[in-house]
A protein has these predicted regions:
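Pepsin/retropepsin-fold aspartyl endopeptidases
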Residues: 1-122
Length: 122
């Protein structure tokens, strides 16, 4: 895990196919992926139309509400921890990948070790 500009980036492995960096964001409801990343995942057949689950309205940090297409990631790996069937949402192409509560809340506890720059998942 790397601290970049005050946020922590952690490598995530999607469907055991592609590894990308995500911001650890406990305030995000779901794992969020920019539209261009989702298109890449579709082109590489990492996800397909069968993974899409409809639209949900999300409330952003500024209080505004935005609809977003949801999809399911078959497997998402962070470090040595892999979860299956993780919900994700599509955000504008200019956004970062966020590692949100649809992943984090499935652990009994999680924390960030600032000294070791590590995400601890239990």
């Amino acid at each position: 895990m790397e601290n970049v500009g005050g946020v922590y980036l952690v490598p995530i492995r999607i469907n055991d196919t592609i590894t990308l960096d995500a911001i650890v964001d406990s305030g995000a409801s779901d794992v969020s992926m920019p539209a261009d990343v989702v298109l890449t995942l579709m082109r590489t057949k990492t996800i397909s139309s069968e993974n899409f689950m409809g639209t949900q309205t999300y409330t952003l940090a500024d209080g505004s509400k935005v609809p977003s297409q949801r999809f399911q990631i078959k497997s998402l790996k962070v470090g040595n921890k892999t979860l299956e069937n993780v919900m994700a949402s599509i955000v504008p192409a200019t956004a970062q990948i966020l590692l949100g509560q649809s992943f984090l809340s499935r652990f009994s506890s999680w924390s960030i070790d600032n000294e070791k720059h590590a995400l601890i998942l239990n």
